[in-house]
Design a protein with these regions (language model features):
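Conserved Rossmann-like nucleotide-cofactor binding loop
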Residues: 12, 35, 289
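Glycine-rich active-site loop/strand segments that organize a redox cofactor
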Residues: 37-71, 145-153, 201-203, 207-213
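C-terminal segments that line or cap access tunnels to active or ligand-binding sites in enzymes
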Residues: 214-224, 279-281, 286-458, 464-489, ...
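N-terminal Rossmann-like FAD-binding beta1-loop-alpha1 element of flavoenzymes
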Residues: 2-29
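Glycine-rich FAD pyrophosphate-binding loop
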Residues: 21-47
Length: 547
């Protein structure tokens, strides 16, 4: 039995372990943190539980599962949970609301049923939208989405990788409302300004999410029906260990030793002892900013493309969460709220309404009735209370600033949705560290951003080092986005590369095409793609024609 050591136990590492253990490999995983799951994990608000109750649930950031996810959804269906699977813990949202400083909440449907009433809501949302968009704005955005939809893969990968989203949609020539909404959403989606994010990533995702919101069927996004580790990660870890995976928590990888073009061992510290781990194959499942530090001269000599990973170390931004525990349940909307005017690019979800089987009276001091989980995607723009960016604020100031920005966005036109006296307590992601009061805070887990031109720096899941494989969201994938889906797909690609290297007869992991924009499983755009591919090969620009 061949042995595989996986360095890093987040979604990528656990996905790789899952696919390997069911194919008969011996698998060991070494995870630095005390809680499994990486960025996806939920975590306790330590010390909040009293009189035998559990600590309140906190998280790095709320989890969501867009309709277009394929790889991670398939994995959820293969993790046992009680009498079913973890997949059964997904629950649909029905709304996506936009909050501004100047108008009441604008509801967008997240799930559209076949009815005239709902169809009219979509029309009204798009054309009588209260966001200041003109018909010219809407037509321009539609034209640009159509361009992405009808462009060939080669053009998207080679040409649009070199164009930022702002320039691609010609935002300079459009209204301030257009710029704020259609250019600004990249900050919320990928924690990256539209003048930096490449169109190869943003374009297909923007099209896919627009189609998912505006076409009937499953909700465009689903959530778990409880804290992530309770409903997914912990059952997954139990399953992996039951299958034979040797999963180590609080095990710090110190170095990876490459000699004569192959990996000889990895050095790990656990329980105060440092030791070498050896295997037939190694999967590095670290995020890019960590992996960059482990790449040695010997590794680069064996595979010069690994220099690209080192270049990507700075292609990260911050997207971290804060949870507000409330004295009463405050649904706000049955889904997510995007705070369009909030300088810190906030999104939130009121979680208790999606957690029917979670009794919050068994948490904290027993009086919490609701959890408002907020993601902060802009840490560099000054806020409304202190005139400072989030990076320069204390934890207490971040709490106050985010709360104030939400109140400004929700309490509009006489409506009072969010009041100070409903706040019980709060929890800021522990990845945000305040080591020196006189300096900016630091972030232990930033998020990869796909800057213009960075596709060329991203590696495949296999390397020129025959026993080293990569599984993380910076790896080249069809998903092409720093997400759980991208991490899971990268893990599958790493496992498939091991199977190939091993000459294994085991069935490879399934890899899905993404962003195919099919309707009823029919690729209606295929003729356009063929036409554009012929033009691209001749060096001609996209023209959107069929022939």
């Amino acid at each position: 039995m061949k042995k595989v050591v996986i360095l890093g136990g987040g979604v990528a590492g656990m996905s790789a372990a899952h696919e390997l253990i069911v194919r008969g490999y011996e698998v060991s995983v070494y995870e630095f943190k005390s809680i499994p799951g990486g960025k996806a994990r939920s975590m306790p608000f330590v010390g909040s539980g009293t009189d035998g109750r559990k600590d309140l649930p906190g998280e790095h950031g709320f989890r969501l599962f867009p309709r277009f996810y394929r790889h991670v959804i398939d994995t959820l269906k293969r993790i046992p949970y009680e009498n079913g699977t973890v997949y059964d813990n997904l629950t649909e949202v029905t709304r996506l609301d936009i909050a501004t400083y100047t108008a009441p909440l604008l509801p967008l449907l997240a799930k559209i049923e076949f009815s005239l009433d709902n169809f009219m809501v979509v029309i009204r949302d798009l054309f009588d939208n209260g966001l200041g968009l003109s018909m010219d704005d809407l037509e321009q955005y539609g034209r640009k989405l159509w361009q992405v939809m009808t462009s060939c893969d080669e053009r998207i990968r080679e040409e649009y990788n070199l164009i930022d989203w702002w320039n691609f949609i010609e935002a300079d020539q459009q209204s301030p409302a257009f710029q704020k909404i259609f250019a600004g959403f990249t900050k919320t989606l990928v924690a990256c300004q539209s003048k930096i994010a490449n169109t190869q990533t943003v374009g297909p995702v923007a099209v896919q999410m627009t189609l998912d919101i505006t076409t009937p069927g499953t909700s465009f996004v689903r959530l778990l029906n409880g804290p992530t580790n309770d409903k997914w990660v912990n059952p997954w870890l139990i399953f992996l260990r039951d299958q034979g995976v040797d999963y180590h928590l609080e095990a710090k990888v110190e170095s990876i030793d490459c000699v004569d073009g192959v990996i000889r061992s990895a050095k790990v510290t656990e329980n105060g002892k440092t030791f070498e781990v050896e295997a037939d194959y190694y999967i590095a499942a670290f995020p890019v900013e960590v992996m960059g530090k482990f790449i040695t001269d010997a590794m680069v000599q064996a595979d010069p493309t690994l220099v690209g990973v080192q270049k990507l170390v700075d292609s990260v931004a911050w997207m971290n969460g804060i949870q507000y525990y409330l004295k009463e349940e405050l649904p706000i909307t049955h889904g997510h709220v995007i705070y369009l005017d909030a300088p810190w690019s906030l999104t939130s979800v009121s979680q208790k309404q999606f957690w029917p089987d979670v009794d919050l009276s068994q948490y904290g001091d027993g009086t919490v009735k609701g959890v408002l989980s907020v993601d902060i995607s802009d840490w560099d723009t000054p806020g409304v209370l202190f005139g400072k960016s989030a990076t320069l604020c204390t934890a207490e100031e971040i709490k106050a600033e985010v709360w104030a920005q939400m109140k400004l966005s929700l309490n509009v036109d006489g409506a009072v949705i969010l009041e100070d006296d409903v706040l019980h307590s709060w929890f800021l992601d522990t990845d945000i560290q305040f080591e020196n009061p006189d300096q900016a805070c630091t972030n232990m887990e930033p998020l990869l951003i796909n800057r213009v031109g960075t596709w060329d720096d991203r590696p495949e899941a296999y390397t020129a080092i025959p026993n080293l494989f990569l599984a993380a969201d910076y790896v080249r994938t069809n998903t092409n986005l720093a997400t759980m889906e991208g991490a899971n797909e990268a893990a599958r690609r790493a496992v498939n590369a091991i199977l190939k290297q091993d000459g294994s007869a085991e069935e490879p992991c399934e890899i899905w095409e993404m962003y195919t924009f099919e309707f009823m499983h029919i690729d209606l755009l295929k003729p356009y793609h063929h036409h554009d591919k012929r033009r691209f090969e001749k060096g001609l620009p996209w023209d959107g024609e069929l022939f």
